[in-house]
């Protein structure tokens, strides 16, 4: 089973039959339209390419326009690809959120919020040094970052200050709380990466 591309709407909460509050993320999944079907003979692997949403005509490049016309679908806001195994799809086919009706858990992939250049305390959860006791300048610095003349260098991968966020993140095995096919919504328990209105990829959980 392939995944779908959706849009993170935001978080809210719902109550179950016992009155327990469940924090959920609302993901809007409009129809994913098939723009290309890749085969073993032509492409060396099997996959399906989809688009969703819409894009201003003035923003669609000529190569993109030709690609969408060939598939017979409206230009979408992007192109995404999912590997397939024995599943059959046709150009222009629409895949909707109801494919998750019988799915218990999903993996959600998105781009985390960018936080710019951050220090070790925020980026890696380092503890801070003493506020007093003679420490006047090094409250939030890392401390030692190496050894001595041997090895005479800082090891690769050393946790230091640097760019935080704005990277591809996958949260695994989120429980599917509700599938609302009429309103094109999927509610999953917990948080998912990314800002409001950002694109997310939802797939059946690998570890379910």
Swiss-Prot record:
InterPro entries in alphabetical order: Ribosomal_uL3 (IPR000597), Ribosomal_uL3_bac/org-type (IPR019927), Ribosomal_uL3_CS (IPR019926), Transl_B-barrel_sf (IPR009000)
PANTHER family associated with the record: 50S RIBOSOMAL PROTEIN L3, LARGE RIBOSOMAL SUBUNIT PROTEIN UL3C
Record keywords, A-Z: Methylation, Ribonucleoprotein, Ribosomal protein, RNA-binding, rRNA-binding
Gene3D superfamilies: 3.30.160.810, Translation factors
Assembly mode: Part of the 50S ribosomal subunit. Forms a cluster with proteins L14 and L19.
Lineage: Bacteria, Pseudomonadati, Pseudomonadota, Gammaproteobacteria, Pasteurellales
One function term, GO molecular function aspect: rRNA binding
PROSITE patterns, per the entry: RIBOSOMAL_L3
Residues found modified as N5-methylglutamine: 149
Name of protein: Large ribosomal subunit protein uL3
GO-annotated biological processes: translation
General function of this protein: One of the primary rRNA binding proteins, it binds directly near the 3'-end of the 23S rRNA, where it nucleates assembly of the 50S subunit.
Record family assignment: Belongs to the universal ribosomal protein uL3 family.
Processing and modification events after translation: Methylated by PrmB.
A Pfam family assignment: Ribosomal_L3
């Amino acid at each position: 089973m392939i995944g779908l591309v959706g849009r993170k709407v935001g978080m809210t909460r719902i109550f179950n039959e016992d009155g327990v509050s469940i924090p959920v993320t609302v993901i809007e999944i409009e129809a994913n339209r098939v723009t290309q079907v890749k085969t073993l003979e032509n492409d060396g692997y099997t996959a399906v390419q989809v688009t969703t949403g819409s894009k201003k005509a003035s923003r669609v490049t000529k190569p993109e326009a030709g690609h969408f016309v060939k598939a017979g679908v409206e230009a979408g806001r992007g192109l995404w690809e999912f590997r397939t195994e024995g599943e059959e799809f046709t150009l222009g086919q629409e895949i909707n959120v109801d494919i998750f009706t019988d799915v218990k858990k999903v993996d959600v992939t998105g781009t985390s919020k960018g936080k710019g250049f951050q220090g070790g305390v925020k980026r890696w959860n380092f503890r801070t040094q003493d506020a007093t006791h003679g420490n006047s300048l090094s409250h939030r610095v890392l401390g030692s970052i190496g050894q001595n003349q041997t090895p005479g260098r800082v090891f690769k991968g050393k946790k230091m200050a640097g760019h935080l966020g704005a990277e591809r993140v996958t949260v695994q095995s989120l429980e599917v709380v509700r599938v609302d096919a009429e309103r094109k919504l999927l509610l999953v328990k917990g948080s998912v990466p990314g800002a409001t209105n950002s694109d997310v990829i939802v797939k059946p959980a690998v570890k379910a």
